[in-house]
Amino acid sequence: MLASTMHLVKRKVGVFSRRQLPRFLSSLRPILISIEGNVGAGKSTLIEELKRRNKNWNFIDEPVDVWSSIKNEDEESLLSVYYKDPKRWSFSFQSCALLSRFQNIEKAMRSVTIQEHLCKDEHSPVFITERCLDTDYHVFAKMLRDKGLIDTLEFGIYRRLYDFLRSSMTIPLTAIIHVDTNPHDCLERIKLRNRTGESELSVVYLQSIEQCQSDWMSSLQDVSILHTGSSSTADISRIEAFVNSQLVP
């Protein structure tokens, strides 16, 4: 079926309206794979290596630049004030994170034109995202609600936003690659990279994330999951084989 779709595209590239494009992209059966893991787990390092080795894949970075660019009158970023005062800023930050992640994912899917994809690959398009909307809701928002940092009313609003954005996604989540790193090791990496706004993080916070991630992934039934502990050559090869196993020939 994909071969016949490709033949049709080669004849009709450029005739699709913006409204028609998501439906047509679905006919190409793209896959969306999320790189999951704790803060400081090594997700970015893994993604950079995958980028270097797989030029045909489409990578979607976590929108940290958006969170860092929104600043108050004291030039403190949203990310920074969230870590400093989570009780005050958890709802604001998590809402921004959810919306900006959705925008990044949808923008990436629309930026890969049909003509460009056909020139690169005969397989289904591959999109690799650093975390996904489900992580925002099932891991971070629920964790903050359980800690009392997002109240019941705020969580109700957040859930409506999540439900709307998730139902608006061009394609659903296909699979997860989980970078499984001990929270203590994560904290050491966080200290070494010295990223703005992260100095307030504690091992207790990282352990809470780890537990929520475990609970969420254990509940998944229709999403394939690969657990990995590093970005070694052997692990990279295993990850690439896992991604390729999700492709529709």
Description of each model-found segment:
Residues T5-L8, L187-P249:
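NTP-dependent small-molecule kinase module
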Residues I35:
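Hydrophobic anchor at the beta1->P-loop junction of P-loop NTPases
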Residues N38:
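P-loop (Walker A) phosphate-binding loop of NTP-binding proteins
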Residues K43:
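Conserved lysine of the Walker
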Residues R52-Q94:
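Conserved substrate/cofactor phosphate-moiety recognition/catalytic segment
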Residues W89-T170:
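Glycine-rich phosphate-binding loop used to anchor ATP phosphates in small-molecule kinases
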Residues Y137-Q211:
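A glycine- and Lys/Arg-enriched "phosphate-lid" helix/loop adjacent to the NTP-binding pocket
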